[in-house]
Amino acid sequence: MPIVSTFDDVRFRPACATDAQAVATLHAASWRRHYRGAYSDAFLDGDVVQDRLAVWAERLGSPLPEACTFIAERDGVAVGFAHGILGEDPTWGALLDNLHVADGLKRRGVGTRLLTLVAQVVAERTPSSGLYLWVLEQNTDAQAFYAARGGICVGKEFAVPPGGDPRRLNGAPMKLRYAWLFPSKLLASA
């Protein structure tokens, strides 16, 4: 796992169990900001933080050997995180399951650094693997971010409802698959 690094007063490190609340809070805030319309208002306006906390307490409390999670902090406050899962798909490779950055720190390199940290783990542990992610079709800012870093849109499917509960979706939103066949190229551009 990469060592702790710092730039522009932001510290990057592997996440641990004690980060679950901070990660859940960031995750919920990002969903509320970017997924409104695709996810139901009842779900987003409800206790989505508690929903995400259950997920992150499990992921960070009992991490899988094929998973990696990084957190970005500024002045001791979590401002971003990324979570990857190695070998998730036989065709596309490792899954970047989450990448979220607090609104105030977007376009400052935090997301790029988090993406690079996951790509570094992929390159070190599964060097012949690709890297991919899913992004909601309505999240055009994220699509532009990934495309600017060499991600290619290679597929489109219906979004899976959070927690498998279809009431959490509005209609049938679509998600797009972005992929990097050679994630090591992300390291060269970092």
Q: What kind of feature is each model-predicted range?
A:
Residues 13, 135-136:
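Active-site-adjacent beta-strand anchor residues
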Residues 91-93, 130, 175:
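A generic structural signal for beta-strand entry/edge sites
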Residues 132-135, 147, 152-177:
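Conserved catalytic-core motifs of GNAT/GCN5-like acyltransferases
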Residues 122-134:
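Conserved GNAT acetyl-CoA-binding A-motif
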Residues 3-10, 14-18, 25-38, 42-106, ...:
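Acetyl-CoA-dependent GNAT
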Residues 101, 136-137:
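Short amphipathic helical patch at the helix-1/turn junction of helix-turn-helix
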Residues 95, 114, 141-153:
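Conserved N-terminal glycine/acidic-rich loop preference
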